[in-house]
């Protein structure tokens, strides 16, 4: 969950003056001591017990009951992603009627569109990062705020904000955005989420009705997409999920979650198969599934998922390197890749593609380059995923990739949102966040990590 500290500027305001939070900024939540009123035109909308946000044109707030969820006993060298959570919502599952499409994908969904630079991440940069920076670095930070990055729907309480973003995109396009803007979101709320790690355990438990709750979460996303059929929207589906079923099935939580993961993702792919949508399922990275022992079973599994969902036309392919650090291409595989011949993402997708095609799926790919600007990295092992030292912002989002298999470079992981806490006493502490190649001290997953932002900015390649 996100837990922001107020800026120094707010703390210095005169006591007789009521501070107002900027649009998209935080205005409440557990531990929040900053402004609770929004600027004109905004309303403070509660997203969960830990976070409330100023949203334009909002009229009501969403209130949730919350309970503590999620424990695990095993850690592995897998990737993890932003947006852990501890909220749970009891809802009734209902499937909305609406159009679906079947058949083969029809071209690169990024072509002819600009990706959405979401105001939420921009507000983090402007209200959390820049106030403690000066000079040239602050100017560069302002440029980062304009880079498109995905919005993470990592708890059900955030789904209503999807409509706010889609409305914002619609307005931009009606105002003549050229090229038109595409919405970019991450669907990330599986029950028993992140089954082989601790840092990003989610809000739903399989043992507590998690499958039904997840389906209600997907129904709510579908409803938002149906309200905005004119907004082209691209989704990354469930980071750190199916890849665990290849390499970490020996972990009790993963073996116990296998059927639920497959059922839930099947439901998501079918329900979100809409004319204005393109989807990419997360497929780990080359250092995870690129090994000879893993890549064949991975191709078979992903192709089966595609076919079991009735070959949805909106399912374009796979997302790789999400929240990770791998190079797109590197001349020599570094020592920390330990002999893995598919050590970079270009090698990985070109090895995976023919296997997928032979299994019945002519898939394409996108790659997260938000934190891969420094190559080789300072990882001790390619599976080290938590707040790795020495990293930098990487290739900017673009559909100009120079590779027929790669639809786009994207920033899925918002740079400087922590991968996980380094506090060994925390309930969600994962040993990877205490490794010598992890930057410390680090806050909880999803919380703003100022030192990490400054590292990414200083080492950005290309530079800002």
Curated annotation (Swiss-Prot):
It catalyses: Hydrolysis of (1->4)-beta-D-glucosidic linkages in cellulose and cellotetraose, releasing cellobiose from the non-reducing ends of the chains. Residues 1-19 form the signal peptide. Residues 103-464 are annotated as: Catalytic. SMART domains: fCBD. Residues 65-100 have a biased composition (Low complexity). Residues 20-55 form the CBM1 domain. It comes from the Eukaryota. Residues 59-102 are annotated as: Thr-rich linker. The active site is at residues 194, 240, 419. Residues 65-108 are annotated as: Disordered. GO terms for molecular function: cellulose 1,4-beta-cellobiosidase activity; cellulose binding. Disulfide bonds join 27-44, 38-54, 195-254, 386-433. GO terms for cellular component: extracellular region. One of its GO terms (biological process) is cellulose catabolic process. It is found in: Secreted. The biological conversion of cellulose to glucose generally requires three types of hydrolytic enzymes: (1) Endoglucanases which cut internal beta-1,4-glucosidic bonds; (2) Exocellobiohydrolases that cut the disaccharide cellobiose from the non-reducing end of the cellulose polymer chain; (3) Beta-1,4-glucosidases which hydrolyze the cellobiose and other short cello-oligosaccharides to glucose. Has a modular structure: a carbohydrate-binding module (CBM) at the N-terminus, a linker rich in threonines, and a C-terminal exocellobiohydrolase catalytic module. The genes for catalytic modules and CBMs seem to have evolved separately and have been linked by gene fusion. This is Probable 1,4-beta-D-glucan cellobiohydrolase C.
């Amino acid at each position: 969950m996100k837990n922001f500290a107020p800026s120094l500027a707010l703390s210095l305001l005169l006591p007789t003056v009521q501070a107002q939070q900027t649009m998209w900024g935080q205005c409440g939540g557990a531990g929040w001591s900053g402004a609770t009123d929004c600027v004109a035109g905004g309303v403070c909308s509660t997203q969960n017990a830990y976070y409330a946000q100023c949203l334009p044109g909002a009229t009501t707030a969403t209130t949730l009951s919350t309970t503590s969820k999620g424990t695990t006993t095993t850690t592995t060298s897998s990737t993890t992603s932003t947006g852990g959570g501890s909220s749970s919502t009891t809802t009734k599952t209902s499937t909305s009627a609406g159009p679906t499409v079947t058949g083969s994908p029809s071209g690169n969904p990024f072509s002819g569109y600009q990706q959405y630079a979401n105001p939420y991440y921009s507000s983090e940069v402007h209200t959390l990062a820049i106030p403690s920076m000066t000079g040239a670095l602050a100017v560069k930070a302002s440029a980062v705020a304009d880079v498109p990055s995905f919005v993470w729907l990592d708890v059900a309480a955030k789904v209503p904000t999807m409509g706010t973003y889609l409305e914002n995109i619609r307005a931009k396009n009606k105002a003549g955005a050229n090229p038109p803007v595409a919405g970019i979101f991450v669907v990330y709320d599986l029950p028993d989420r992140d089954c082989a790690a601790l840092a990003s355990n989610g809000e739903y438990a399989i043992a507590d009705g998690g499958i039904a709750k997840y389906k209600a979460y997907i129904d709510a996303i579908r409803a938002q997409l149906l309200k905005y059929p004119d907004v082209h929207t691209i989704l990354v589906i469930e980071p750190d999920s199916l890849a665990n079923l290849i390499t970490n099935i020996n972990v009790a939580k993963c073996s116990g979650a296998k059927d639920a993961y497959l059922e839930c993702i099947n439901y998501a792919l079918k329900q979100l198969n809409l004319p204005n949508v393109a989807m990419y399922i997360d497929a780990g990275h080359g250092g995870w599934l690129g090994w000879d022992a893993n890549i064949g079973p991975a191709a078979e599994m992903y192709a089966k998922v595609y076919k079991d969902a009735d070959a949805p036309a909106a399912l374009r392919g796979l997302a790789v390197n999400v929240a990770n650090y791998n190079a797109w291409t590197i001349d020599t595989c570094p020592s920390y890749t330990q002999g893995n011949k598919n050590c970079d993402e270009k090698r990985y997708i070109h090895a995976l593609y023919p296997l997928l095609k032979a299994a019945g799926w002519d898939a394409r790919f996108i790659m997260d380059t938000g934190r891969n600007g420094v190559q080789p990295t300072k990882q001790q092992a390619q599976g080290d995923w938590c707040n790795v030292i020495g990293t930098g912002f990487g290739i900017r989002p673009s559909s100009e990739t120079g590779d027929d298999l790669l639809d786009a470079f994207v920033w899925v992981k918002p740079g400087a949102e922590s991968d996980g806490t380094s506090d060994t006493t925390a309930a969600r502490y994962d040993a990877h966040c205490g490794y010598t190649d992890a930057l410390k001290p680090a806050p909880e997953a999803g919380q703003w990590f100022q030192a990490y932002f400054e590292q990414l900015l200083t080492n950005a390649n290309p530079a800002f």
